[in-house]
Swiss-Prot record:
Organism name: Homo sapiens
GO biological process: host-mediated suppression of symbiont invasion; immune response; negative regulation of collagen biosynthetic process; negative regulation of transcription by RNA polymerase II; positive regulation of MHC class I biosynthetic process; positive regulation of MHC class II biosynthetic process; positive regulation of transcription by RNA polymerase II; response to antibiotic
Record GO terms (molecular function): acyltransferase activity; ATP binding; DNA-binding transcription factor binding; GTP binding; histone deacetylase binding; protein serine kinase activity; protein serine/threonine kinase activity; protein-containing complex binding
Name assigned to this protein: MHC class II transactivator
Protein location: Nucleus; Nucleus, PML body
Keywords, in A-Z order: Activator, Acyltransferase, ATP-binding, Disease variant, GTP-binding, Kinase, Leucine-rich repeat, Nucleotide-binding, Nucleus, Phosphoprotein, Repeat, SCID, Transcription, Transcription regulation, Transferase
Pfam families membership: LRR_6, NACHT
PTMs per UniProt: Autophosphorylated, affecting interaction with TAF7.
Binding sites annotated in the UniProt record for GTP: G420, K421, A422, G423, Q424, G425, K426, S427
Amino acid sequence: MRCLAPRPAGSYLSEPQGSSQCATMELGPLEGGYLELLNSDADPLCLYHFYDQMDLAGEEEIELYSEPDTDTINCDQFSRLLCDMEGDEETREAYANIAELDQYVFQDSQLEGLSKDIFKHIGPDEVIGESMEMPAEVGQKSQKRPFPEELPADLKHWKPAEPPTVVTGSLLVGPVSDCSTLPCLPLPALFNQEPASGQMRLEKTDQIPMPFSSSSLSCLNLPEGPIQFVPTISTLPHGLWQISEAGTGVSSIFIYHGEVPQASQVPPPSGFTVHGLPTSPDRPGSTSPFAPSATDLPSMPEPALTSRANMTEHKTSPTQCPAAGEVSNKLPKWPEPVEQFYRSLQDTYGAEPAGPDGILVEVDLVQARLERSSSKSLERELATPDWAERQLAQGGLAEVLLAAKEHRRPRETRVIAVLGKAGQGKSYWAGAVSRAWACGRLPQYDFVFSVPCHCLNRPGDAYGLQDLLFSLGPQPLVAADEVFSHILKRPDRVLLILDGFEELEAQDGFLHSTCGPAPAEPCSLRGLLAGLFQKKLLRGCTLLLTARPRGRLVQSLSKADALFELSGFSMEQAQAYVMRYFESSGMTEHQDRALTLLRDRPLLLSHSHSPTLCRAVCQLSEALLELGEDAKLPSTLTGLYVGLLGRAALDSPPGALAELAKLAWELGRRHQSTLQEDQFPSADVRTWAMAKGLVQHPPRAAESELAFPSFLLQCFLGALWLALSGEIKDKELPQYLALTPRKKRPYDNWLEGVPRFLAGLIFQPPARCLGALLGPSAAASVDRKQKVLARYLKRLQPGTLRARQLLELLHCAHEAEEAGIWQHVVQELPGRLSFLGTRLTPPDAHVLGKALEAAGQDFSLDLRSTGICPSGLGSLVGLSCVTRFRAALSDTVALWESLQQHGETKLLQAAEEKFTIEPFKAKSLKDVEDLGKLVQTQRTRSSSEDTAGELPAVRDLKKLEFALGPVSGPQAFPKLVRILTAFSSLQHLDLDALSENKIGDEGVSQLSATFPQLKSLETLNLSQNNITDLGAYKLAEALPSLAASLLRLSLYNNCICDVGAESLARVLPDMVSLRVMDVQYNKFTAAGAQQLAASLRRCPHVETLAMWTPTIPFSVQEHLQQQDSRISLR
């Protein structure tokens, strides 16, 4: 809003001459301030120019009103202003009137919708300068600002005034017609260097008309027009910059850092004050809601305007956290309660340990995707990517969350799900996010709230969003109402973490549940979560979930905006963790010995890809190494946990371990892993369990809340209860192995580690298993259960089980260490094992390899879409009993390259000879590219002197299907044609595969050129490829090259007309080996059909000609069929 000082009565302005003089007019006292001035003949520019030239000595002082301790409005203040306007009817009406006035004054291009009565709502109390008098008369030559109905009808040639120049404490913004001349003086030289005493530095937004010929701007080319003072950003470096193309309506921006003193052109204070607009409620900033703030200026990055601390976005190690609580004093501060809550929340998260025992080894975060599903089910499964096509999230958690902010629409909630198996470190990863925010590595968020999902399984319907953020977590947060109001105004700067999503009850209906639309309405916790997932509550926030996937994902997870998986430790990361563990324990002398113990147990080494199990191995190794040099780790997972709990059970109260096992089982039945202190049967049991580390307080949890330190420990204790309990009938025990699906089972296998531990506890020798935990009396009670399970396992037929159940059976048999069961399982394995689409973890690959070696027969493995790691693939391929295998092309080529680099010639030769791709179906562009890499590998080998011969996979390929569809098909087909001649044994080329590839005439022409090299081709399927007469002509020209081999030719459902039919009829007698030809659903007429029928009579070798098409009269087709029965109309 312009801040103008009306001239006192009796002033005169000179007549304009050219473009620099003003018309002579008499100005009397103006009453009503802005409104009368707008309707008067006074030109504000001339008025100010007149004051600039006149001697003000002896005149009444005119003072610009300035509020002390004010600043330009920022985004947070403006948001509060809007919220208060919405709640106050009078304020909302007043600001609506001001908005109409602003639109009338400044937005000239939108005058069509305004009228004179926009001022009728402004009362006398809102009129500025009401004590001033109206002029008696105005000059006839002055122009009033016309109202819309007074404007000419043709507004096309009407040009709005140039945008005003804006000068801030650090910025000067304005239109510049010619910026070739840079200012020769520092920017303060444009104004008074030494303002008069008593004058205030401008702290509000003012606009002062400046003539272009002003001497003070002689070195800076600015057009005539108003200059606006906005003292805002003071963090820019000293200097003056010009930024072109700054934004709409501004041709240039001049940025200057430094104090801007009072302008010399402003008249000294007078007897009256020109008041500003009403100050907006709860806002210490500018007196005008339309004054631009720092956030309104172009080219300013958001973090520089909204970050509450001096934070850096680059990576910071957990041990090098900057001072997170240091708040910039150059930015507008939050209210004191918000600042205090912000600091306390940072202190809370920053005090949490980096990992178990303070050890942190970061695991890889992999982008996940869902399987394509043609069913209508809302639940979908995770796809299993090949090892080579995994997409790692570069930059870790910070990059994931930064990308989430960049790719979402404004005010749109972003849901991110991080998935992982039990023990992969999801909860520690979620804690790492909170610590990263506390250390200043996530400046895009003002607040982070981490809530374990087990805290949300509470009854009642009187909860609100404020309870979810502050009260329902493990440790309630103290926050004033002002903090909650601040959060609601900026939800896009809030990160909410829900850890352990699998522990929520009825988690599959959040997207369809009803919830209150307003945050203040109380509802159930389920309603609150539904409001978050339906993006009605706290809309615009980032919602981060961690969950353990079990089969199909519920819709709340499958509909997430981004999916990631924790891949666990690699072999190198596991060994690094072992080294750091013993280093932190002060036992560096045992580091090498511990690694040797681990390498001697390949199963435990493969299980160490799980951070939880890797830590358990380190704990047991530490205990064994303290006993002596002859220490050895157990060979099974059951033995690992027996070793960990055996020492704790030695000095336990009577029955304490059994009571703890029962408690773990009951919690697992309810999908829970946390418990209260009063749930223990006695205080002695609780004290013992806490002292031995079997239960512990979760981070930031209440004193009465306890949890098992790992999910696998809970599974082991649950299996221990099943092995000891007399409450479970023996005949029901096999159901808990979960190897054969049943419609009714006692539990849903939520404790997914129970089957393996149960087999190990029951079948392993009692002296080193149950007897070591509970004594000889407990071991005697499992004899009957052992017989029941042995009978059940020996009746199973491994060849009838699904791949996942077969792997679980192998794990159970391995844990049992019972020779009869192991021999039965491995000898019943089928010769062809397919794990297509079933994920193979490192322990799966190890147990499978042991079973294949013990079987004593040859096997063919299908390892496609299993995500098997390179070391696991190499170990299986290297087995002598594996004669053939299929795996992802990219993984196999990478394995060959690795073996060649390491000089493993024999293993490389075996891997090349055993690999097959028969049959091969290309369903994506990546499949075609991988096939091209395979052919390129063969060509490289052929040109090398030390190797010779074709790759068996390329040489023996007989069937190739191309099914990319109409979008990718035309793009990928030329790449396939270029490598097609490498498959010398190709017999079946299917370019239909129930998908319209639409290779067209161009594709047929390219394919025809390869026919002379495809000597073995017997079946050619070109159906549904948009082939016309031109394509049929090209095909007919090249078909004689296949005369000796081609048996079946299909051109079903193309666009072949009579000319194309004639071309095919002409070549048909030359195809001496052809037996079946299909030209149904084309566009040729009776003439084309008759030519084909006539040619067929000269081809006694052809058995069937399918040629029904709707363009031929049925009577003609029937007549042709009567003449030759080989014509098929079906």
